[in-house]
Amino acid sequence: MAALKALVSGCGRLLRGLLAGPAATSWSRLPARGFREVVETQEGKTTIIEGRITATPKESPNPPNPSGQCPICRWNLKHKYNYDDVLLLSQFIRPHGGMLPRKITGLCQEEHRKIEECVKMAHRAGLLPNHRPRLPEGVVPKSKPQLNRYLTRWAPGSVKPIYKKGPRWNRVRMPVGSPLLRDNVCYSRTPWKLYH
């Protein structure tokens, strides 16, 4: 009964707002964008706290390359980001950590794949701790068992690093990072090392 009453009162409020026009209802107007300042004024025993719009924000800056086909190309960021640029990556992921589709982000195929790889690497490095699926209420996560990823009969705790991987001319190198990011700009004197 209470739900029906709330539904009827909500519909009545909606109809009154539509019939009265946008001037009468505050929710039908678009909110003004701008910086607000909290102002406290006291009149006798009443304190009035209001937010006044102080200054309108400037228009968004024009991209340096407006003819680019995706946002990364338009802002000339094609080979200039990595997995540790979390502010850039967080614009292309959902709140639970998954990638947004290309239709929404507007990225080209190449940049979408690179952003996806960077998001994976950032998750593995623990740089996106707040972007993971929420557990249901009251569920305590179990501790994950340490699996033997080395597929050997010895315990993973007994594994020691191989300090000598062979002579320098015949050394067995280990791939590091992603081959998708090999064209990134290197700001140091030494070139990128994709194999360590």
Swiss-Prot record:
Cellular component GO terms held in the UniProt record: mitochondrial inner membrane; mitochondrial large ribosomal subunit; mitochondrial small ribosomal subunit; mitochondrion
Quaternary structure annotation from Swiss-Prot or TrEMBL:
Component of the mitochondrial large ribosomal subunit (mt-LSU). Mature mammalian 55S mitochondrial ribosomes consist of a small (28S) and a large (39S) subunit. The 28S small subunit contains a 12S ribosomal RNA (12S mt-rRNA) and 30 different proteins. The 39S large subunit contains a 16S rRNA (16S mt-rRNA), a copy of mitochondrial valine transfer RNA (mt-tRNA(Val)), which plays an integral structural role, and 52 different proteins. mL66 forms a zinc-binding site with uL10m.
List the Gene Ontology MF annotations in alphabetical order. small ribosomal subunit rRNA binding; structural constituent of ribosome
- Give compartment(s): Mitochondrion
- Alphabetically, which GO biological process terms does the record hold? mitochondrial translation; translation
Q: What else is known?
A: There are 3 mitochondrial isoforms of bS18 in mammalia, localizing to 3 distinct sites in the mitoribosome. bS18m (bs18c) binds to the same site as bacterial bS18, mS40 (bS18b) binds to a novel location of the 28S small subunit, and mL66 (bS18a, this protein) binds to the 39S large subunit.
Keyword Mitochondrion listed? The answer is yes
Major localization class: mitochondrion
| Keyword Metal-binding among UniProt keywords | no
What are the alphabetically sorted keywords of the record? Mitochondrion, Ribonucleoprotein, Ribosomal protein, Transit peptide
Domain of life the protein comes from: Eukaryota
- One of this protein's Pfam families, by short name? Ribosomal_S18
The protein depicted here goes by the name Large ribosomal subunit protein mL66
Instruction: Give the record's family classification.
Output: Belongs to the bacterial ribosomal protein bS18 family. Mitochondrion-specific ribosomal protein mL66 subfamily.
Tell me the organism: Homo sapiens (Human)
Transit peptide boundaries: 1-34
